[in-house]
């Protein structure tokens, strides 16, 4: 029943938005279109996935497939990272460099009581990192630092290959990726 209703709502929204002008700001249709898009985004941000790992329940806001996949593979994608966090002393300070959506920041803060500095330069991931921190009531444990870390003090370009929530593998000050190949910058 839930999938059926979701399908009906999606089709109504698609039909409505296809008739709405895309640029005439004075149009009632345009304003209605913006309103509908805002309501749709609000609904997307209400999707929460809970993952239980070693008795610690973590909540993740999952508005798209990629963020949902990251939450679902939390325990299997980087088992060595989880082992490392488990080996830390309780209350240790942790720097999560490239925190993305905060998967490991959340776990360290919840499981070890760590004070976490979550470095994440992607504007597309910062919103979910903040929402995930809030959903898990860890604002007092996780400090979000919206900058890239480098071995130099400078201003440079952030080469983003992905503009989705949960996107990764971007570079700071370099136009090649982890594999040494030139990256196709999607957003600079």
Say what each PLM segment does.
Residues 1-188:
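S-adenosyl-L-methionine
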């Amino acid at each position: 029943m839930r999938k059926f209703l979701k399908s009906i709502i999606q089709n109504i929204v698609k039909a409505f938005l296809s008739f709405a002008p895309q640029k005439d700001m004075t149009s009632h249709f345009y304003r209605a279109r913006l309103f509908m898009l805002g309501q749709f985004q609000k609904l997307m941000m209400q999707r929460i996935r809970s993952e239980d790992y070693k008795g610690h329940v973590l909540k993740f806001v999952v508005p798209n497939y990629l963020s949902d996949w990251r939450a679902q593979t939390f325990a299997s994608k980087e088992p060595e990272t989880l082992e490392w966090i488990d080996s830390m002393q309780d209350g240790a300070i942790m720097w999560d460099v490239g925190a993305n959506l905060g998967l490991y920041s959340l776990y360290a803060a919840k499981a070890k009581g760590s004070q976490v500095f979550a470095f994440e330069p992607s504007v597309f991931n910062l919103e979910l990192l903040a929402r995930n921190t809030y959903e898990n009531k860890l604002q007092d444990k996780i400090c979000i630092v919206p900058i890239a870390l480098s071995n130099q003090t400078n201003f440079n370009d952030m080469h983003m290959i992905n503009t989705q929530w949960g996107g990764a593998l971007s570079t700071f000050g370099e136009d090649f990726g982890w594999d040494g190949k030139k990256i196709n910058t999607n957003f600079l």
